[in-house]
């Protein structure tokens, strides 16, 4: 979203004196715009505070670890064979997120499902699908136990989904930026 490693490093360097002079997390929110640099510094400041207090970060944040949170293991877009091999490693996980495009969609999902039959699947279509493809694929996606399709259409094209009766839940990503 318009960021690069160089731009993030530049933003961090630009406020390094402020950080050395005690810039805190609250001041950081007004100093840097939302993005990777602010997030990295915010995380580092939380970690620093926990170390100063000699307590685990989850205590600093008042997080009760007895309430586990399920998170998805993300598999990057690749050939169906390579995605299946990677998913096999995570076959005991509860949730896998597959990053896909417009190519080899069903083949990739089938290959992953065969290698990892247990996890729920989230499909991140990366804005690469059309409404016609969703209509064509939705029954098979349902049969492959796909739990969610993330951002199937290009950002700004979501209105075509408003009257669409989908079998698999659909959520936004890039459309929210």
Please give the residue ranges for each predicted region.
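A short, conserved beta-to-alpha structural element at the edge of catalytic cores
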Residues: 144-158
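Residue-level detector of anion-binding/catalytic polar loops
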Residues: 56, 147, 169
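Catalytic alpha/beta core domains of metabolic enzymes, predominantly
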Residues: 156-177
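Short, glycine/acidic-enriched loop or turn micro-motifs at the edges of active sites
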Residues: 102, 127, 153-154, 176-177
């Amino acid at each position: 979203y318009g960021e690069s490693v160089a731009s993030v490093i530049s933003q961090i360097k630009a406020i390094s004196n402020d950080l050395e002079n005690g810039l805190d997390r609250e001041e950081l929110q007004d100093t840097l715009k939302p993005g990777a640099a602010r997030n990295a510094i915010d995380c580092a400041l939380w970690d620093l505070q926990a170390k100063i207090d000699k307590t685990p970060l989850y205590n600093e944040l008042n997080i009760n670890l007895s309430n586990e949170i399920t998170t998805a293991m993300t598999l990057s877009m690749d050939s169906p064979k390579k995605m299946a091999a990677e998913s096999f490693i995570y076959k005991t996980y509860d949730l896998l997120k597959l990053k896909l495009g417009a190519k080899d969609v069903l083949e990739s999902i089938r290959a992953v499902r065969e290698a990892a039959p247990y996890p729920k699947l989230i499909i991140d279509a990366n804005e690469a699908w059309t409404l016609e493809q969703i209509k064509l694929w939705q029954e098979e996606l349902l049969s492959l136990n796909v739990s969610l399709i993330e951002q199937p259409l290009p950002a700004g094209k979501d209105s075509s989904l408003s009257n669409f009766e989908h079998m698999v839940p659909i959520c936004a990503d890039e459309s929210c930026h």
